[in-house]
């Protein structure tokens, strides 16, 4: 297990270094799959997946809006993420292989997924105050 974690840390550093040539601040919000075989991450406002062994990352979201905060479902088949697609930050799900995202929340505030429970329910925070666009720390938020 220790070797796998060291390998994972090395891959994240190499991946970050590769993307750092564009902008060191674009690679964000990574999440390791339940089986430890893949990493979902945000890069330039879209969600990507890469094997922990390395290789080419595959883009699973494509949208002019900013997609962020990827989380894996417990079975590893679905990615839960937040997106600013409808003028507020809502929660979506998409198959890990890619496909059409499905909107799960539609509140006027900003929702951020925090964890996905074994039964598939999502714990998220919701902010009724507008934070700075794409901010990481919403003001006035509550956990649901």
Region spans (language model):
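Periplasmic/extracellular electron-transfer cofactor-ligation site
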Residues: 51
